[in-house]
Design a protein with these regions (language model features):
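Hydrophobic alpha-helical membrane-insertion segments, chiefly the h-region
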Residues: 22-32
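N-terminal secretory signal peptides that target proteins for export/translocation
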Residues: 1-11
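Compositional signal for N-terminal targeting/processing segments
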Residues: 17, 30-340
Length: 340
């Protein structure tokens, strides 16, 4: 993905998350040189999910995500790039004493396939210089964006390393970089899915997969998907190859700073979430098979995550006027509260 001006024409922007540069919040986007239309894509069947009605707070969500491995082999945990809340949650998951008992693999967007040996050495506890470790994310396709320069990504690797230091060698967690580095000609999502298949599913293992939330959407406008070529979404690709084995979780809420000049047709009314929830604790995880959350509008609550700038009229959400609901997008969501 790359930064692009909102003045760009005839492109779509795939918003993966946010980052901060010199104190200015920016939206990470990707350029797609294909047409956009409102037709909807076929929805892969979502497997039934047994979840508590509400899992409140970081620790409560972490426990529920770990318990989800009793039902699924893959927990796909979407993030908003650079957000501290997402970092705190995934670190809480890997530090939980039950995580390493059930899960031995993690696949991340912020590591390249070509620096796997470096990442392995660091996660095992070997002495690796900062300059060497930085190559793990600096050799990804997204390095030019600066999105991985946030310290939260190195902190995640450090957290897994610390967990492994307390475990016997045969019980340690391995972290895989899923982004194709230099010399790896595969597309981003093809590479990620290949890593999950070869290193986890074909070995009858389980994995936590951490990528920008848009990679885990189970449904998108049809013509948007056609513009992406083979990269139709990691969760979709895994569901097609291994039905019922992936649990997709996406973030909703919190601030979203759009590119200059971009406005959304519908602003999210987070009071709908707040009225429907029993707990006042944020963040909170809820199932997207549960009413009323499953019926909330995708355009309203995640419409700012994927934009198109094709044609006249400026940039707009690819979900504009879409009938898609949140229940068609993922299996569960982590609600961070209102956007203020």
């Amino acid at each position: 993905m790359s930064f692009t001006s909102v003045a760009a024409q005839n492109v779509s922007l795939r918003v993966i998350g946010m980052m901060t540069v010199a104190g200015v919040a920016m939206v990470t986007v990707g350029v797609i040189n294909e047409p956009f239309a409102k037709a909807q894509s076929p929805k892969p069947a979502s497997p039934p999910v047994r979840l508590p009605d509400e899992s409140a707070g970081i620790e409560g969500i972490a426990r529920t995500l770990i318990a989800a491995f009793d039902q699924f082999d893959i927990v796909a945990l979407g993030e908003a790039h650079g957000r501290q809340l997402d970092s705190d949650l995934r670190i809480a998951v890997v530090r939980h004493p039950d995580f390493a008992k059930n899960v031995r693999s993690i696949v991340v967007e912020f590591g390249s396939t070509t620096e796997q040996s470096t990442l392995d050495r660091y996660i095992r506890g070997e002495n690796i210089s900062s300059a060497q470790l930085e190559q793990v994310w600096k050799t990804t396709t997204q390095a030019a964006n600066g999105v991985w320069e946030s310290p939260i990504y190195a902190e995640f690797f450090a957290a897994v390393r610390e967990v492994n230091a307390k475990l016997p060698a045969d019980a340690r967690v391995r972290v895989f970089g899923g982004d194709p580095g230099p010399g790896d000609s595969r597309s981003r999502e093809i590479a990620a899915v290949a890593v999950v298949k070869e290193q986890v599913l074909e070995k009858r293992g389980k994995a936590l997969v951490i990528y920008g939330a848009a990679h885990f959407y189970r449904n998108m406008p049809r013509d948007y998907l056609s513009s992406m070529g083979a990269d139709i979404g990691i969760a979709r690709m895994l569901e097609m190859a291994y039905p019922g084995r992936t649990f997709a979780v996406i973030p909703v809420g919190g601030p979203l700073d759009l590119p200059p000049g971009v406005t959304l047709r519908i602003q999210p009314d987070y009071r709908k979430f707040d009225r429907a929830l029993q707990t006042q604790v944020r963040p909170v995880l809820v199932s997207l098979q549960r009413s009323p959350f499953r019926d909330f509008s995708t355009e309203e609550f995640i419409g700012g995550q994927v934009l198109t700038c094709r044609g006249t009229g400026g940039c707009r959400s690819v979900f504009q006027s879409s009938p898609l609901t949140l229940g068609q997008m993922a299996d569960a969501l982590v609600y961070a509260g209102g956007g203020s």
